[in-house]
Amino acid sequence: MPCCLRRSILLWLALTMTGASLRAEEPAIERAHAETWRRFIDEHGIMRDYVGELPTPEDCRLGKPNAIGWWSPIENGPMFTGMYLHAMVERARRSGAAADKDQARRLAQGLLKCASVSDVPGFVARGVGSDGKCHYPLSSDDQMHPWFLGLHAYLLSDIPSADERKVLVTKVREVAGVLESNGWRVPCDGAFKGDFRGGFKGEHFRDAARYLYLLRATYDIDREAARIRSAGLPDVLAERLRL
């Protein structure tokens, strides 16, 4: 990830999402946000890693430079977009500005786009290439988690319209259902269709935290308690997740 984008994302997220005494009119914050938006948010509402030549359908099909899309402008679309959306929802809550709500809405549509370009149910693409649809075949858990993070924050806000909310809830339910049916593993596309890359039920410490978060987030969104019950969690923990 280029240092300039890393700095912009960390600056924006840190300053927007903490309790520091910062105001929207702070010039440095506004310049960072405006420049990040101008340079890295594409026409679909997906954040790119950097400004550069987009992969073509052939590049994506052949896995150039690799099937994961590493070192391409569309390597981390859901990761960056989901985190940025989480911050934009908070910014809109604080400011109440229509422009902030519009930008949050655009980012939510970007996440929806990432989950709508494949015929593999539950697949969330890393981004889209030059034709607005082509994508690399391998997603990952580090893309999937921020995808839920952003949409969770957005759908708990008052920003989406009733129609938009219905579409997004349906998509979240679809993706969550596929993950659950696959043992919370992340599906692949293209030449790797039927395989998985990453998941949320491993033995690492982060898997426990992210798995519990996904259960709570999806319940907040679709109110389906059966998903929590089927996880086999202790009764006390299951009840807390449904609070």
Question: For the regions a protein language model found, what residue spans apply to each?
Answer:
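N-terminal secretory signal peptides that target proteins for export/translocation
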Residues: 1-5
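Bacterial N-terminal signal peptides
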Residues: 8-19
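Low-complexity, Ser/Thr/Pro/Gly-enriched N-terminal "stalk/linker" regions
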Residues: 24-79, 105-106, 110-127, 163, ...
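Solvent-exposed loop and edge beta-strand segments that line ligand/cofactor-binding
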Residues: 65-84, 131-143, 188-211
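A structural signal for well-ordered alpha-helical segments within the folded catalytic domains
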Residues: 78, 82-89, 102-105, 109, ...
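Well-ordered alpha-helical scaffold segments within catalytic/enzyme domains
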Residues: 82-97, 146-163, 209-222
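Elongated scaffolding segments in large macromolecular assemblies
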Residues: 162-222, 230
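Acidic, His/Gly-rich catalytic cores of divalent-metal-dependent hydrolytic chemistry
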Residues: 221-243
